[in-house]
Amino acid sequence: MSQQVIIFDTTLRDGEQALQASLSVKEKLQIALALERMGVDVMEVGFPVSSPGDFESVQTIALQVKNSRVCALARCVEKDIDVAAESLKVAEAFRIHTFIATSPMHIATKLRSTLDEVIERAIYMVKRARNYTDDVEFSCEDAGRTPIADLARVVEAAINAGATTINIPDTVGYTMPFEFAGIISGLYERVPNIDKAIISVHTHDDLGLAVGNSLAAVHAGARQVEGAMNGIGERAGNCSLEEVIMAIKVRKDILNVHTAINHQEIWRTSQLVSQICNMPIPANKAIVGSGAFAHSSGIHQDGVLKNRENYEIMTPESIGLNQIQLNLTSRSGRAAVKHRMDEMGYKESEYNLDNLYDAFLKLADKKGQVFDYDLEALAFIGKQQEEPEHFRLDYFSVQSGSNDIATAAVKLACGEEVKAEAANGNGPVDAVYQAINRITDYNVELVKYSLTAKGHGKDALGQVDIVANYNGRRFHGVGLATDIVESSAKAMVHVLNNIWRAAEVEKELQRKAQHNENNKETV
């Protein structure tokens, strides 16, 4: 009988470190709920002591997620563990994940300590975490470059202190698969109490070996794999969870293990992470790339038509990618749109049907037929822009040509007031942005601009994702339309609303702090 491999997702903690702009609490919650729907066993959602924003994100997700265990990261520092526990206490089930470096290089140059002192601190902090929960994970940072005898000492001590999961990270993506398998096997041979904990692995992709190392570790006895959707993460990224999950499913004959993942949710979750994080998926990305199931060779096409198994080791449907897509028109009713959303697996709580249907009709009038990918894009944009808006794009027009200076006129609703400005720019998009800056006086600096086609052909929707700098902080914005300039304008307005909302939150926090201070003085 096969054993289960626990899937530990760190998209919202380690994965977020790769992003140019931090995710909002709402965006993190969207991803967390998608991960829960996909069936991840554990989700690491933040580092609460690092900032009030991270604390709020962890607390919000802990309150909402019911079917996955919510985890927070903490260094082997008392305050870290106490704050992590405080942020997680509202959760249905939670885990505290604490870590300390164990390699000679890290101990000597980073910690300026000794192995004995590291072990002593690990024991104390694991015990402290156990005061809050029975589920404590301990990580040996840079385990891949830690001598096996030293690593075994640390692991044995952490298990004796109460750690229920021991994580072995290849922190810098240095280890080869056969080496990593040897580390796991070596721990099973050397640590007498290893049967009292689950052995986990956390690999990085600096040499392109993250997935290979994780699978080698599973083959050697590891029973938890940590990673991020689409492999996002610091430097070259984390282990791609979708790749490990499908490798375990497809090669069960070799690995003899399974996961509790709902495979049909993989593609949808991957797309959501890509959209929210503003990180396009390469076409040749394994499992979820747009070309993952494409066949261009005539010989391959002929073979697939005769029997898909000739050249496909898994089907698009196995990850939730349905190739037959129903098209809707402006004559399709609200019920038809809802029915299609139901068929694609969306719950009513995940989108506003009235808003979605209004956006659908406008799009159908422009392009005639609306496909599944159009509906998904509209639902995503609608969810992103549900929060209160101070700015709204009322009108814009542009004039440009090969020998002309681009000019834009923009009307922007700012609260109850509508303001208008015109400006020149280096192309129509820049002209629109210059006009918007004149209206608001925010003077945001564009850091990143990307355009993604949602669909196929000349009528495809264009999704514009931008990152803008304002007062030392980075804000993300997204816009969607059949017209690229309109998408660009909407993305900038989304940025402005995010800036405005952040300022409102700051005002509210200051108001509460002042209120608390006044109460103290009264007492």
Swiss-Prot record:
Residues 392-523 are annotated as: Regulatory domain. Keywords: Amino-acid biosynthesis, Branched-chain amino acid biosynthesis, Cytoplasm, Leucine biosynthesis, Manganese, Metal-binding, Transferase. GO terms for biological process: L-leucine biosynthetic process. GO terms for molecular function: 2-isopropylmalate synthase activity; acetyl-CoA C-acetyltransferase activity; manganese ion binding. Its EC number is 2.3.3.13. It is found in: Cytoplasm. PROSITE patterns: AIPM_HOMOCIT_SYNTH_1, AIPM_HOMOCIT_SYNTH_2, PYR_CT. Gene3D superfamilies: 1.10.238.260, 3.30.160.270, Aldolase class I. Pfam families: HCS_D2 (PF22617), HMGL-like (PF00682), LeuA_dimer (PF08502). InterPro entries: 2-IPM_HCS-like, 2-isopropylmalate_synth_dimer, AIPM/Hcit_synth_CS, Aldolase_TIM, LeuA/HCS_post-cat, LeuA_allosteric_dom_sf, LeuA_bact_synth, PYR_CT. Mn(2+) binds at residues 14, 202, 204, 238. Belongs to the alpha-IPM synthase/homocitrate synthase family. LeuA type 1 subfamily. NCBIfam families: leuA_bact, PRK00915.1-1, PRK00915.1-3. This is 2-isopropylmalate synthase. The lineage of its organism: Bacteria, Pseudomonadati, Pseudomonadota, Gammaproteobacteria, Enterobacterales.
